[in-house]
C-alpha cells in the first residue's frame, strides 16, 4: 500500500532519526480493507510502537488512506499473489487534498488505573478524574496540566479522554498536538476550507491539546484557537490542555489567550520523588511481563531522577538486553547495562552545577549564595539550592553542608524540610522549583 510509505515519510520528519530507524522502519503494512495491520519483527517493537507512536500513526493513516483502524502484530506481511495485468484506465482529474480528519485517536493504553500516583502528581490526577466525571464544569474547564516533558501530562490527558468515553461511549473526544492544530489550520487556509475546519469542533464533547506553548508567536493560530476555545467553553464542552510551563510565562502568547487559560484549573506536574519513581519502574515492568527485582527498581529510581520517560528508557534498555542475552536481571546486570546512562546522569547534575544554576536564576553572585549572610533574599535561594542538592544528587547531608561553606548537616535538613513545606502553600516557590528542576535536567 502506498499510504504507509507516505505515513512513514511524515513520521521521519516528526521523530528523531534513531527512533524511526529502530522502531518504525522495521514495520510492514498490510491493507485488509477495513483495517491496516502493521507487522513487527518482535513483540518488543510492538510494545514500543503501541506506547509511543500508535496515536500518530492512526491519524496519519486515516488521512492518507481514509482508514484509521490499525492493528499491530508480530510477524511478516503475507506475500500477495501476482496481480493480473491492469487495463488502461481513463485519466481521472486530481482532487484537492482533504483536511486531515480529527477522528477520535485516543490511545486506550493510557488509563487512570495504570497511572502511578505520587506526591508530585496527585493533584493533577484528581483534577483529571474530576474533568472526566464532570466534563464542562467551570471549576476545571479548562484543565491545564503543566510541567517538564516526560512527567505524565499526556498520560493524564489520554486517561481523562478514555474515562469520559467509557462513561459515555458516544462522546466525541478529539486529541491533537498543538502542531497538528497549526498544520490543519494552514492547510484549511490554503484550500479555502476554513468553514470546514471550524465545523470540526462544533459537535465534539471534549478537546484535548498537547503542548500549547508551540502556539507562541503564531498569531493566526492563536486567533482561531481563541474562537474555538470560546465556543467550546460557552457550550460547556471540556477542554484539557498541557504546557511545558505555566502559560503566563510563555512569551508570544496573547494576553487574552493567557487570560482564558486561567479561567479553569491549572495544575503543576512535578518530577516524581524516589518512591514514585520506584513504583513507576515496577509498574512498567509488570506491563511488559518482565521480572524486575525490587533492588533493581530502586537502583534505577535512585539514579534516574529527571522524568518518567528516562525511567522507561532505562527499563526498556535493561529488558531488551536481558531478552537478547538470556541473562537474569540483577543489580550487577543493571549496573553493567546502564553504566553509560547512569554516568551521564551523575555528571549532568552535581552540587556545583546546582549552585550556579540557582545563583543565576535568582540573579545572585556565587559568593553571596555561599556566604554566612541570612537576609531573606539570600537565605531562601540558599535553602532551595540545598534542597535541590538533596533531591538530585546522592550526596549525604554532611557532604551537602560542606559544599555550602561548611554548614552543619542539621542546617541542610532544616532547609529541605522548610522548602518542602513552603512549596505546598507558595505557588511561586513551587514554580521556581519546577523551573530549576527543568533547567538542571536539560
From Swiss-Prot:
Protein location: Cytoplasm
Record bears the keyword Ion transport: no
GO terms classed as biological process: DNA replication initiation; regulation of DNA replication
Segments for region (Domain III, AAA+ region): 105-322
Region of interest called Domain IV, binds dsDNA, as start-end residue ranges on this chain: 323-442
Main location: cytoplasm
Stored CDD domains: AAA (cd00009), Bac_DnaA_C (cd06571)
Top-level taxon of the source organism: Bacteria
Pfam family, one: DnaA_N
Keywords of this entry: ATP-binding, Cytoplasm, DNA replication, DNA-binding, Lipid-binding, Nucleotide-binding
Region (Domain I, interacts with DnaA modulators): 1-75
GO molecular function list: ATP binding; ATP hydrolysis activity; DNA replication origin binding; lipid binding
Region (Domain II): 75-104
Matching Gene3D superfamilies: 1.10.1750.10, 1.10.8.60, 3.30.300.180, P-loop containing nucleotide triphosphate hydrolases (3.40.50.300)
Residues that hold ATP according to the record: 150, 152-154
GO cellular component, one term: plasma membrane
Subunit structure and binding partners: Oligomerizes as a right-handed, spiral filament on DNA at oriC.
Family to which this protein belongs: Belongs to the DnaA family.
Domain notes: Domain I is involved in oligomerization and binding regulators, domain II is flexibile and of varying length in different bacteria, domain III forms the AAA+ region, while domain IV binds dsDNA.
Function in brief: Plays an essential role in the initiation and regulation of chromosomal replication. ATP-DnaA binds to the origin of replication (oriC) to initiate formation of the DNA replication initiation complex once per cell cycle. Binds the DnaA box (a 9 base pair repeat at the origin) and separates the double-stranded (ds)DNA. Forms a right-handed helical filament on oriC DNA; dsDNA binds to the exterior of the filament while single-stranded (ss)DNA is stabiized in the filament's interior.
Protein name as it appears in the record: Chromosomal replication initiator protein DnaA
Species assigned in the record: Xanthomonas oryzae pv. oryzae (strain PXO99A)
Source species taxonomy: Bacteria, Pseudomonadati, Pseudomonadota, Gammaproteobacteria, Lysobacterales
Amino acid at each position: 500500500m502506498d499510504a504507509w510509505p507516505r505515513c512513514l515519510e511524515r513520521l521521519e520528519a516528526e521523530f528523531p532519526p534513531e527512533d524511526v530507524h529502530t522502531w518504525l522502519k522495521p514495520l510492514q503494512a498490510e491493507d485488509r480493507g477495513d483495517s491496516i495491520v502493521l507487522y513487527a519483527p518482535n513483540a518488543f517493537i510492538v510494545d514500543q510502537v503501541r506506547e509511543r507512536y500508535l496515536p500518530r500513526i492512526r491519524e496519519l493513516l486515516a488521512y492518507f488512506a481514509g482508514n484509521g483502524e490499525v492493528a499491530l502484530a508480530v510477524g511478516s506481511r503475507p506475500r500477495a499473489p501476482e496481480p493480473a495485468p491492469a487495463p488502461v484506465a481513463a485519466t481521472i482529474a486530481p482532487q484537492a487534498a482533504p483536511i486531515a480528519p480529527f477522528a477520535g485517536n485516543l490511545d486506550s493504553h493510557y488509563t487512570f488505573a495504570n497511572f502511578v500516583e505520587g506526591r508530585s502528581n496527585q493533584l493533577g490526577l484528581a483534577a483529571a478524574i474530576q474533568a472526566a466525571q464532570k466534563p464542562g464544569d467551570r471549576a476545571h474547564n479548562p484543565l491545564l496540566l503543566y510541567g517538564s516533558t516526560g512527567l505524565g501530562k499526556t498520560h493524564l490527558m489520554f486517561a481523562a479522554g478514555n474515562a469520559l468515553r467509557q462513561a459515555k461511549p458516544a462522546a466525541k473526544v478529539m486529541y491533537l498536538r498543538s502542531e497538528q492544530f497549526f498544520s490543519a489550520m494552514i492547510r484549511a487556509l490554503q484550500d479555502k476550507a476554513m468553514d470546514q475546519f471550524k465545523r470540526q469542533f462544533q459537535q465534539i464533547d471534549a478537546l484535548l491539546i498537547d503542548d500549547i506553548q508551540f502556539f507562541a508567536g503564531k498569531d493566526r493560530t492563536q486567533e482561531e484557537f481563541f474562537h474555538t476555545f470560546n465556543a467550546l467553553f460557552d457550550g460547556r464542552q471540556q477542554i484539557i490542555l498541557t504546557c511545558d510551563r505555566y502559560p503566563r510565562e510563555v512569551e508570544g502568547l496573547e494576553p487574552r489567550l493567557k487570560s482564558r487559560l486561567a479561567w479553569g484549573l491549572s495544575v503543576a506536574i512535578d518530577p516524581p520523588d524516589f518512591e514514585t519513581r520506584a513504583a513507576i519502574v515496577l509498574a512498567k515492568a509488570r506491563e511488559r511481563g518482565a521480572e524486575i527485582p525490587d533492588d533493581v527498581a530502586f537502583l534505577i529510581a535512585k539514579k534516574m531522577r529527571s522524568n518518567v520517560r528516562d525511567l522507561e528508557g532505562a527499563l526498556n534498555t535493561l529488558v531488551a538486553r536481558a531478552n537478547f542475552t538470556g541473562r537474569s536481571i540483577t543489580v550487577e546486570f543493571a549496573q553493567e547495562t546502564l553504566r553509560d546512562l547512569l554516568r551521564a546522569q551523575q555528571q549532568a547534575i552535581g552540587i556545583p552545577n546546582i549552585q550556579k544554576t540557582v545563583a543565576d536564576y535568582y540573579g545572585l553572585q556565587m559568593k553571596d549564595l555561599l556566604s554566612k549572610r541570612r537576609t531573606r533574599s539570600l537565605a531562601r535561594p540558599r535553602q532551595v539550592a540545598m534542597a535541590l542538592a538533596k533531591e538530585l544528587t546522592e550526596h549525604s547531608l554532611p557532604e551537602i553542608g560542606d559544599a555550602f561553606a561548611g554548614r552543619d548537616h542539621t542546617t541542610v535538613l532544616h532547609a529541605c524540610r522548610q522548602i518542602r513545606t513552603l512549596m505546598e502553600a507558595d505557588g511561586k516557590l513551587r514554580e521556581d522549583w519546577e523551573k530549576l528542576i527543568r533547567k538542571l535536567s536539560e
